[in-house]
Amino acid sequence: LAEFFPGQDAGRSWCYDVEIGAHQLVPTGVLAPRGREVERIVDHMEDVQFLADGWFDYPAAANRADWYNLGGFSKVQPYYTRNCEVYALRDEVKPFIRSYFNSIAALINPEVLTLWEHFHHSGAWDKTHETGYFLHQTRTMLVQERGEDLWLAPFITSKWLEDGQGVTVRKAPTRFGTVAYEIIPHPQANYVEARIEPPARRLPKQIVLRLRHPEGKPMRSVAVNGKK
């Protein structure tokens, strides 16, 4: 769009090549998440668009110098961009987590914990759309339907399974009904405890709980209701 309408929308038509660009065809079901086209789209977003000159706090030189912390999100209105959804559909855990937290850091108002429209000081404050999409991403982090399967904790950070940490989810809405679960790590004893209250309206074909050890150690055994 930028080459054809460079002055549109306060001179920011360039951002629509990525924020409402071709990647939107993935979560809407037009492009297969694991297709070669989608891999190229995501690579271009990460390597080019997310590191280009953005609004206010994000000049290209700074983005490229600190690509890990300042990458992973678009540079005008990050929650227009659905790259976290694309990562979730591709089951790419670490890219999802990076984009999730980097976007929050770019938009959060630390005084009242609301979300700006355009980064730390610009646009609407306490923005409804940004709040809604933050909740949408958080829900995907904690609960995700995959066909007739229900995944729990599919994209949580492994830091939450360190000593003294844990995850508790209550009354999470899914198309199977509400679900609840709790993950309690016991790193000193080398095990993780999980309690699940499955949905009652319609049972999923499978309930999948993802547990990633903070140090990357493999799982040795599993016991369900006391039975291995």
What are these regions (language model features)?
Residues 2-146, 205:
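Active-site core of glycosidic bond-cleaving carbohydrate-active enzymes
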Residues 93-228:
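Non-catalytic C-terminal accessory modules of carbohydrate-active enzymes
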